[in-house]
């Protein structure tokens, strides 16, 4: 199997990605960054996962935001 050391999504499930984004941004800020109803109205991991698994464009936006967050965290680690 090919190693993907530079891919922050490799080996991550959408549930883990979502939980990390919620921990980093919080639901309110996440709802502003990605304007999806399940992030803004009574947000929960369960309802968000159901929506993301059925809606490819939304899942792509969540993955892109995760990569952005990951790169910011790596930049901070590299400056310290």
Can you annotate each of these PLM segments?
Residues 1-80:
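Long, compositionally biased intrinsically disordered regulatory segments in eukaryotic proteins
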């Amino acid at each position: 199997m090919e190693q993907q050391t530079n891919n922050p999504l490799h080996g991550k499930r959408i549930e883990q990605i979502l939980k990390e984004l919620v921990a980093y941004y919080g639901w309110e800020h996440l709802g502003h960054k990605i304007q999806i109803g399940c992030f803004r109205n009574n947000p929960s991991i369960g309802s968000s996962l159901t929506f993301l698994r059925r809606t490819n464009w939304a899942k792509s936006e969540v993955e892109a935001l995760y990569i952005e967050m990951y790169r910011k965290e790596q930049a901070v680690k590299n400056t310290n």
